Structures are given as structure tokens and as C-alpha cells.
Amino acid sequence: MKQHIILFLMFTLCYTSCNRKANVSDVGLPKSEEKSLVALGQLWGFLKYHHPAVANGNYDWDMELIKRIPLVCEAKNDSVWKKLLDNWLDSLPPVPENPNKKLPNLEIKLKPDYGELFNPEYFYPKTIDKIRFILDNAVVTTNRYVKVDEKQQGQLFITNEPFYNELLYPELSYRLLALFRYWNIINYFFPYRELCDQKWSTVLTEMLPEFVYAKNREEYIFACLKLVTKIDDSHGTLSPNLNIGLLSVPFEVQFIENQLVVTRFTGNDSYVKEKIKIGDVITSINGESIDAIVKKMLPYTPASNYPVKLRGISSSMFLSGNSTIVNIVVQRDEKTFHFKIRRYDRRLLNATDYGNPQPDKEGYRILDNNIGYVLPPSCKVEEREQGVKKVLDGTKGVIIDMRCYPSNDYIIPSFKAHLKLRQEYNMMISKPNVSYPGYFFMHKLDSISQETKNLHIPKVVIIVNEYTQSAAEDYVMEFQIIPGSVVIGSTTAGADGRVVNFDLPGNIYTRMTGWGVYYPDGSNLQRAGAKIDEVVKPTIAGIKAGRDELLERAIEIINESNH
């Protein structure tokens, strides 16, 4: 009981100290407090992944941080908090000297960034020397907080991170714990740290006020969402996401020719189907222009690139909410219409999944003019062998529609076997190493290539767009190995590599990409997306006419190749 009272008083002091200068989130922290918290958060994360005693779980490391936050905030000057951090280092078991420590003999794709750990403005020179000694000598072979499973090709797992579900609106120390936990995980175990628009070492300082001054659970969740958005990763989701309401209108929209266009009905509301037309352009929602809404939502929409940000905004956020009625303004044929549209429970609507363009179609079929067509989400294990044979044997070519997320039936080996393709190195990946936090090392994965030059390979056209993400992008890379294959469409999601899940205080769940994926020449798929041979995008006129212009172009390419 006495310990709980002491901790409560420390939290109260911390909150008062860190909030005494301001009470809104757009006001910065006093410089001294900003520096001291950055130093504390970065040292805490460094020790978590580098010091053997901490990595082994000998301490309740969250609580070690929480106990020190009030002390750092209340420090009267820099010398006080710098001494506190130096004493903290001295309190840990000494690390033995290890002159034999060296990096693995592997190509380095990404090197660590230690932020302010070696900056004398943040630490005493003697403290920096101690940090350097730990870095150069400590050996961590297993870590309570992170695991790399080589049996799963280096799959990364973030482990033993409590989410404190009883703290729906965490007090200040736990909000800072969330910020420090996330920042350090990204700093040491995110493979694309160097691709972020903002230098990651500057993010901690910028985001401190957002977490310090979050006045309620909603502001805290939005601070977390803004933080996740800064990794520029389409895998970087956050749950709960307050941008997404429980209700939604009974139609889907998509950005086409830089305008928000109605593309498909998802419910049976007769009023909506009477008033709204496919191809309508929505110019305003609840009195706010589309451009203004996009600008407001971009900082809270995690994605690898701009097309995927628009995908997220249009598919989940624009027309969803918790009120039953939404007011929209529609432009159609130079006329303007105002409608009140009812929202429905999202679960009752027939929404497409990851952009699957034809959810009711079979996985393998033959189009007109004897062209094979594969829709991976609809592919079933029991149909695979006959299906692959059906679309490849005697056809002019095959279209693989990757504007979607594939099913669990991995069809690549069957294509490889049917086309008599052999294994060859194609895809490159970068993986982390628990013993060397912050480093990512390059490895090769097997893929496919042609075995016999004289073998007839049918023309293969792969269709992609912003819904082509993760495993779908893997498929594209694999199919690109087939000689003569062509990729058409627009920028893909740019988020390949296995997903890593972890928790933040306040019952919050988030994700990130856990390993790097690259083309054989070392070029990035992350953020840039899959390599495209011909850019093809839908038009508003095509949507109005009910045409699939990308599919039409794919058919044209195959027909042209047979002339």
C-alpha cells in the first residue's frame, strides 16, 4: 500500500510538472523537460535491447521507466537529471569486456541510429562512455521483449509488452511509456526506418507534447495514430481507429482522376439507388469540402504512399461515422445535388474485401477469345491443379488480377511446376538480429525462373492498383519472373514483408512490417510499390459506363501478343 501511495504522488508531481507550462497539444514542452524526457526514453529503450540483465527480464522494465519519469520531470536543472540517468546505469550489473564481439559476415542493409545517446547535450561524457562500452561489449542472445524465429525465415515477434487494458485513458507516465515503447521498437526493429519521410530520431521530440497534453482517451488514441502514421507503412494500423465509425453509407467510393467517385452499391437502400448514380462525384460531406477533409485526415492515415492514404480515407473514413444521417453534395453532368443519406451497420453491408473487383466470380475461368483469368481471392486448394491447367493450356495468355488480397491457397508453385520453371534467387529480404538491435542483414529467398529457353510460355499480364498489398505484392514479384510477363495498373500499397503485432498501454493494438523485401537489384518495394510496366488507371467515364478499363487493357495486350 505504501508503495502505491508513493507512486501515486510521483505520478501527480510528474503530471503537474510536465503540464504546468501549457494545456493544449500544440504547445511545446519547456526545453529542459523535452531534453530530459528524450534522454530518458532513448536510454530506457537502448538498455531494454542491449543490456543482458534487462533483456533477460531481470527487471520490470516498464516500472523502472515509470518510477523515473516524475524524477526527471521534477529535476531543477540539467545536471540533476543527467546525474540521475548516470546513476541508473551504475545500478545495473556490470557488462564484462568482450573483445571478440563482431558483426555477422552478412551484407548490412540498415544500420542503427542511436539518436541522442552519444550527444553531450543530453548525457555526461562519462555516461556516454558507459553507453558505448555496453554497445561494444554486451552480448544478448535472447531477449524477453523481442524474438526472431529463424524457423519462420526470420519472422520478428514483439513479446511481453503489457497493454494495461484497465487504463483506457492512461495517466501521463503510461502515455509516455506508450510513446517510448513504440519509438524504440521502430528505432531498433523496423526494416524501413530510413525510408520514413521524417527522420525517425526527430519524431520522439515532436510527439512528446501530443502525449503529454492528451486530455482524454480520444486525444491519446489520436496521438498514437499520428505516431503510427509517421512510419509511412501501409501495414501500420492502429486499433481502435476513431476515424472509422460504426456506421457507413450503402455504397463505396474511390479516388478517380483526383475526384471522389461512387463506384459500387453495397446495400439495398432504394432511396440511395434512386438518387445516387455510379460515377457520381462527391464534392462535400457534412458541409466540408473533400480537399479539406483529406488535408485534415492525412496525418492520421497510416500508409506507405499517397494513393494508399487516399484508399484508406475513401474506403473507411469519408462516409463512415456514428451518426445515422450524412449530408453529401454530388456533382453529375455539370449539375449539383444535395442528399441526406442514411448510414447502416457496416457489418450488414456487402463491402468488397481489399478491393476484390469481382467477389462473386470463380478463381479460374476462361474469358472471351480464349484468355485465361485468375482471381486469387477466389482460388481454392481443391481446384488449384485443374484451375492452373485450365488457364494455361492452349490459351492465348493468362490475366492474373491482383487488385485484391489472395486467399490462403498459394498458387505460385503450381504455376512454376506447370510451366517447368526452376528455383532461382529472386527476392531479397532484410532481417533483424536480436544480438545487434538496429541492424538489418540481407538474405536471399528462392523464387522461380525459366528452365528451358525453348519452352512456350503463354503471355502473362498482372493487374495491380493501390489494393495490391503485402502477400499480393509478393505474388506480383513472383509472377514478374515469368518471361514476357507484363504488369499494368497503378501504384501498389508498397508494404511487403511479414506483419508484426504488438500492444500499447490503454488496450491499443498496432502493427508494422517486420522484415524488408527487395527486388534482386536491391530496389525497394516498400513505399514505391511493385514495378509497373504500363500505367493504366480507371476513368470516371469508364466507371459510369460500367467498364473495367484495366481488364480491357490486359486483354488487348494478350491479343496483340498473338498477332
Regions found by a protein language model. Give the residues of each.
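Bacterial Sec-dependent N-terminal signal peptides
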Residues: 1-25
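N-terminal mature-domain "stem" immediately C-terminal to a signal peptide or N-terminal signal-anchor/transmembrane
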Residues: 22-74
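Cleft-lining beta-strand/loop regions that shape enzyme active-site pockets
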Residues: 32-35, 48, 73, 186-196, ...
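PDZ/PDZ-like domain segments forming the peptide/carboxylate-binding groove
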Residues: 33, 38-41, 45, 115-150, ...
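Stable alpha-helical elements in mature extracytoplasmic
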Residues: 36-40, 64-68, 77-88, 175-179, ...
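Conserved PDZ fold ligand-binding element
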Residues: 43, 47-51, 182, 273-308, ...
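Extended, small/polar residue-biased N-terminal targeting/export presequences
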Residues: 54-66, 70-160, 192-257, 322-327, ...
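Low-complexity, Gly/Ser/Thr/Pro-rich intrinsically disordered linker/tail segments
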Residues: 537-563
